[in-house]
UniProtKB/Swiss-Prot annotation:
PANTHER family: D-MALATE DEHYDROGENASE [DECARBOXYLATING] (PTHR43275:SF1). It comes from the Bacteria. It catalyses: (2R,3S)-3-isopropylmalate + NAD(+) = 4-methyl-2-oxopentanoate + CO2 + NADH. Keywords: Amino-acid biosynthesis, Branched-chain amino acid biosynthesis, Cytoplasm, Leucine biosynthesis, Magnesium, Manganese, Metal-binding, NAD, Oxidoreductase. Transmembrane segments: none annotated. This is 3-isopropylmalate dehydrogenase. Homodimer. It comes from Corynebacterium kroppenstedtii (strain DSM 44385 / JCM 11950 / CIP 105744 / CCUG 35717). The gene is leuB. It holds the Pfam family Iso_dh. Pathway: Amino-acid biosynthesis; L-leucine biosynthesis; L-leucine from 3-methyl-2-oxobutanoate: step 3/4. It is found in: Cytoplasm.
Length: 342
């Protein structure tokens, strides 16, 4: 298995090392191994030579089965938006990572801000390359009293359908329920396309129950009845917002993993923890590597290593449930890896 590894900045290097440790432990005895290539991408490289992501970088990344990312950014030295647009979004569009996958699980032992959350275990399938993030907009008469700015949400049948099909496939593997989240009563054109696509594709997945929530109602249900959700499919902007809410409901983004996926398999998909680079604690050995480890499990699952993914997720669940509150980065990774060897 050939993995491109982007440790990135801050705690990214530390948590990625533990993720790889656990992934190798999960593969032990299978006859398979992980071959890694490290890429110096992120704030450090940008500050050193002004480069973000070159054509040579992209060509080299494409030679791998998948990409494991730690975290990038340093708000102390790089202005907001530079790395997001020039590195992360560029990679997403060029490598056609049209699916953003975000599992949301409330693990035993983790405190939710909800008084009685019940069992929380759902995934959000967010469209990643269209919508309001497609970059279709502009401004005129800037810095005048008559300034005009617009951002156009771009939604294509092709783009919507491939994400909807991916969501239905995931629903078939899970509890067989899919919820479309949008705002069809106001966004009648984009919302109409999403609703019609879901209705039509649903005819091929008759064992999956389908329902619909306006985005505002979905945020209410996520804090009053999160167990109602199994697979949520939604557009780029709504998905960006609702996944952060899902992270908060399940104890914070420190445990949240994500996948940026080319569902066709043409390009390598990328997996990363949702948390940032946390430069304030970098090098102290206290960063929680759990989200990075769970990102490794997502990577395995994407590549068909279901048993290994299941084993990592079970090991994480057991470890999180038995923690005493203190975190040492290397100790957590070693403990989870050793539990897979036993």
């Amino acid at each position: 298995m050939k993995l491109a590894v982007i440790p990135g900045d801050g705690i990214g290097t530390e948590v990625t090392a533990e993720a790889l440790k656990v992934m190798r432990a999960a593969l032990a005895g299978s006859g398979e191994s992980i071959e890694t290539t490290d890429y110096d991408l992120g704030a450090r490289r940008y500050l050193r030579n002004g480069e973000l992501l070159t054509d040579d970088d992209l060509a080299s990344l494409r030679e791998h089965d998948a990409i494991l990312l730690g975290a990038v950014g340093d708000p102390r030295t790089v202005p907001s938006g530079v790395l997001e647009r020039g590195l992360l979004l560029k990679m997403r569009f060029v490598l056609d990572h049209h699916v953003n996958l975000r599992p949301s699980v409330l693990y035993p032992g983790v405190t939710s801000p909800l008084s009685d959350p019940g069992k929380v275990d759902f995934i959000v399938v967010r469209e990643g390359t269209e919508g309001l993030y497609a970059g279709n907009g502009g401004s005129i008469r800037v810095d005048t009293p008559h300034e005009v700015a617009n951002e156009t949400s771009v939604n294509t049948r092709y783009g919507v359908e491939r994400v909807v099909r991916y969501a239905f496939d995931r629903a078939q593997e899970r509890r067989k329920k899919l919820t479309l989240v949008h705002k069809t009563n106001v966004l009648v054109y984009a919302g109409g396309l999403w609703q019609r696509t879901v209705d039509q594709v649903a005819q091929e997945y008759l064992d999956v129950t389908v329902d619909y929530c306006h985005i505002d109602a979905a945020t209410i249900y996520m804090v009053t009845d999160p167990s109602r959700f199994d697979v949520i499919v939604t557009d780029n902007l709504f998905g960006d917002i609702i996944t952060d809410l899902a992270g908060a409901v399940t104890g914070g983004i420190g445990l949240a993993a994500s996948g940026n996926i080319d569902a066709t398999g043409t390009n390598p998909s990328m997996f990363e923890p949702v948390h940032g680079s946390a430069p304030d604690i970098a090098g102290k050995g206290i960063a929680d590597p759990t989200a990075a480890i769970l990102s490794g499990a997502l990577l395995f699952r994407h590549l068909g290593k279901t048993d290994e993914a299941d084993a990592i997720e079970a090991a994480v669940r057991n470890d999180v449930a038995s923690r005493d509150g203190s975190i040492r980065t290397e100790e957590v990774g070693t403990r989870i890896a050793n539990s897979l060897d036993s």
